[in-house]
Every structure is written in structure tokens, then in C-alpha cells.
């Protein structure tokens, strides 16, 4: 987590893994000291197994437990990360309220979908030389803001993809980043 505001606490949660070629996964939760008070931020990288929706759903359930601890009722949480799933996937819909949520009363606004609903916002794109040709393109990286009412929807000011152009001939990653400007 990179922040202009001080990190006042941090905690790590281990996520379930699927075995085989899957890697160990964690969620990192921090509290940022913002002018509006502490801001809980949770970031993660969910399983990349192609047929791993079942596993990512289990991992999202752990995110729900983490949010219960981290958010402590503030309803200000931000969730970011490589979820390795498109917006219509069950694991993403669990966070955005499209299905039952992992933390009762906790639903998130997808910053990209709110500010650019007509744009795909592909963060994984075969046009990126680091992406192998057999990987489907799509938006799998997210900034999600807690949706505690109409006021929360106004927190997301803008979004854009970053890292889409090489610097000195080098791409930063196989994924493009999502930059979201939020009112905190």
C-alpha cells in the first residue's frame, strides 16, 4: 500500500490456496490516518487458477472476515487488488452486491464501473507484451469503495488506467494499473 497519509496499523490475513501450481495468497489490511479519520484499506491478489472461481469465492469470504475486523463499522473501507476475475464473476459480485456479500451490510462500489460505465477498462490485455497470447483480456484489477449510501458513491471522483505505455521501452507489469481518485 502506497499512501501519502501515514499508515497507523497493518495486519495480514492468509487466504486459502488451491494446490497444484497455485501460489500462497494474502490480504494486507492497513489503517491510513487521513484528514477525515482512519481509513481502512485492504489489498490482495486472489488465485489466478483459470477454473478457480470456487477458490476465489472462498478467498473473498476471508476478505469478509478481514473487513469485519478492519472496518469496525466505519463503512469507509477501500478494497484494491488483482482479483483475477471479471466484473460479472461471482467472486467480484459478492463484493459489489450482485450476490450475497461476505460481510453483512458491506457492499462496495466498483470505482471504474461508476466513473466509466461504457468503457471496458481492460487491465489484462494481449496488447501488453508481458501477456501471453492464450490469456483472455478483461478487467481483473479493482479499486472498490465501501457503498454506505449515496454519500459513499460520491467518494469516487475519477479513474484511469496507468502503466499502459512503456517507459524507456519497458512495460511496468503484465497488468495495467487502476488509478482512482477518492474523496476521503
Language model: regions and residue ranges:
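Structured beta-strand-rich core segments of catalytic domains in phosphoester-bond hydrolases
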Residues: 1-40, 44-46, 142, 158-161
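Catalytic metal-binding/acid-base residues of hydrolase active sites
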Residues: 6, 45-47, 83-86, 115-117
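Short, acidic Gly/Pro/Ser/Thr-rich loop/turn segments
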Residues: 9, 48-49, 151-152
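Flexible, glycine-rich phosphate/dinucleotide-binding loops
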Residues: 19, 50, 117-120
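His/acidic metal-ligating clusters that form di-metal
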Residues: 29-42, 53-94
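Metal-dependent phosphoester-hydrolase catalytic domains
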Residues: 68-77, 85-184
Amino acid at each position: 500500500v502506497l499512501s501519502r497519509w501515514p499508515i497507523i496499523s497493518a495486519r495480514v490475513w492468509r487466504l486459502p490456496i488451491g494446490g497444484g501450481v497455485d501460489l500462497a495468497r494474502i490480504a494486507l489490511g492497513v489503517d491510513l490516518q487521513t484528514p477525515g479519520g482512519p481509513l481502512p484499506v485492504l489489498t490482495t491478489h486472489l488465485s489466478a487458477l483459470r477454473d478457480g472461481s470456487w477458490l476465489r469465492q472462498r478467498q473473498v469470504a476471508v476478505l469478509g472476515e478481514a473487513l469485519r475486523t478492519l472496518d469496525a463499522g466505519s463503512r469507509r473501507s477501500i478494497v484494491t487488488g488483482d482479483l483475477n476475475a471479471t466484473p460479472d464473476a461471482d467472486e467480484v459480485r459478492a463484493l459489489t452486491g450482485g450476490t450475497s456479500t461476505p460481510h453483512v451490510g458491506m457492499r462496495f462500489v466498483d470505482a471504474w464501473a461508476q466513473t466509466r460505465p461504457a468503457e471496458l477498462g481492460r487491465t489484462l490485455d494481449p496488447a501488453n507484451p508481458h501477456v501471453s497470447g492464450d490469456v483472455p483480456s478483461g478487467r481483473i484489477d479493482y479499486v472498490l469503495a465501501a457503498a454506505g449510501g449515496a454519500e459513499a458513491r460520491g467518494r469516487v471522483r475519477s479513474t484511469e488506467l496507468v502503466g499502459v505505455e512503456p517507459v524507456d521501452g519497458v512495460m511496468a507489469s503484465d497488468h495495467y494499473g487502476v488509478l482512482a481518485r477518492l474523496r476521503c
